[in-house]
Amino acid sequence: MLKNLKDLTLEDMKVKRLTLKKEYMDLRFKTVVGHVENPLKKRELRRDIARLNTIIHEYAIGIRKV
């Protein structure tokens, strides 16, 4: 996943973050209802969202350049 993130533009990262958040919320709902095929997917999504947040924040504070 990390190799793919470095190739994305900042706007693409923001869109990807929104889609991952939506997917994470859907998975959380399915967990509450009681039917999840892969419970580890929730952890993977949460970590991918955190990675994206970190990279987006690095652009915002100037560590990474556009």
UniProtKB/Swiss-Prot annotation:
Disulphide bridges: none
InterPro entries from the UniProt entry: Ribosomal_uL29, Ribosomal_uL29_sf
Keywords: Ribonucleoprotein, Ribosomal protein
Keyword Ribonucleoprotein: yes
GO molecular function ontology, one term from the record: structural constituent of ribosome
GO CC annotations, alphabetized: ribonucleoprotein complex; ribosome
UniProt cross-references to Pfam families, sorted A to Z: Ribosomal_L29
Recorded superkingdom: Bacteria
Gene3D superfamilies per the UniProt record, alphabetical: 1.10.287.310
GO BP annotation list: translation
Family per similarity comment: Belongs to the universal ribosomal protein uL29 family.
Official protein name in the record: Large ribosomal subunit protein uL29
Gene: rpmC
